[in-house]
Curated annotation (Swiss-Prot):
InterPro entries: P-loop_NTPase, Shikimate/glucono_kinase, Therm_gnt_kin. ATP binds at G11, V12, S13, G14, S15, G16, K17, S18. The keyword ATP-binding applies. Keywords: ATP-binding, Kinase, Nucleotide-binding, Transferase. It comes from Rattus norvegicus. This is Probable gluconokinase. Belongs to the gluconokinase GntK/GntV family. It holds the Pfam family SKI. GO terms for biological process: carbohydrate metabolic process.
Length: 185
């Protein structure tokens, strides 16, 4: 992958997005963003109460993330983003902006492609049981394990024509990182 580019590490909560994304950014020397850090307080409160987010909750968040990625890519900085990006529409917003969503009052909803073909989606996938078990062990996160089923219900795994790879979270962290680095060659 020629720089600048974007590596989107996606999957349901508990799939290891943040851990894998941070490791890859470190190995590649790229900037790392964890999308969870950019949720509005309202979204955090809603999830903390066990209420799943809907498209209206997610779209402004995704448009803001697109703007951050666009700024970095435009300045020549390659980026790793850890983000659930459960639906194709969400991944499209991250890559191309929000022109296919209802208009907003600000200018960030304009379509501005990030990196053309330099947008690789890494889908970290695993069984509900495995990931639910991980969530039960996790402490200090605003996303309760009870919301996992709602994420699996709306998940649209990447498929052609998206530029993607699926990686099982049954593998160890070194194996996952090696598979992604190989895909970037």
């Amino acid at each position: 992958m020629e720089t600048p580019g974007v590596l989107l590490v996606m999957g349901v909560s508990g799939s290891g997005k943040s851990t894998v994304g941070a490791l890859l950014a470190n190995k590649l020397g790229w900037k790392f963003y964890d999308a969870d850090d950019y949720h509005s307080e309202e979204n955090r409160i809603k999830m903390g109460k066990g209420v799943p987010l809907n498209d209206q909750d997610r779209i402004p968040w995704l448009c803001s993330l697109h703007d951050i990625l666009l700024r970095d890519v435009a300045s020549g900085q390659s980026v790793v983003l850890a983000c659930s990006a459960l639906k194709k529409m969400y991944r499209d917003i991250l890559n191309r902006g929000g022109s296919d969503v209802p208009p907003r009052s600000d200018e960030s909803a304009k379509e501005e492609p990030l990196a053309g073909g330099k947008f690789l989606v890494v889908h970290l996938c695993g069984s509900f049981e495995l990931i639910y078990g991980r969530l039960l062990q996790r402490r200090g996160h605003f996303m309760p394990p009870e919301l996992l089923q709602s994420q699996f219900s709306i998940l649209e795994p990447p498929s052609a024509p998206e530029n993607f790879i699926h990686i099982s979270v049954d593998k160890g962290l070194p194996e996952i990182a090696a598979a992604v680095l190989e895909a970037l060659k």
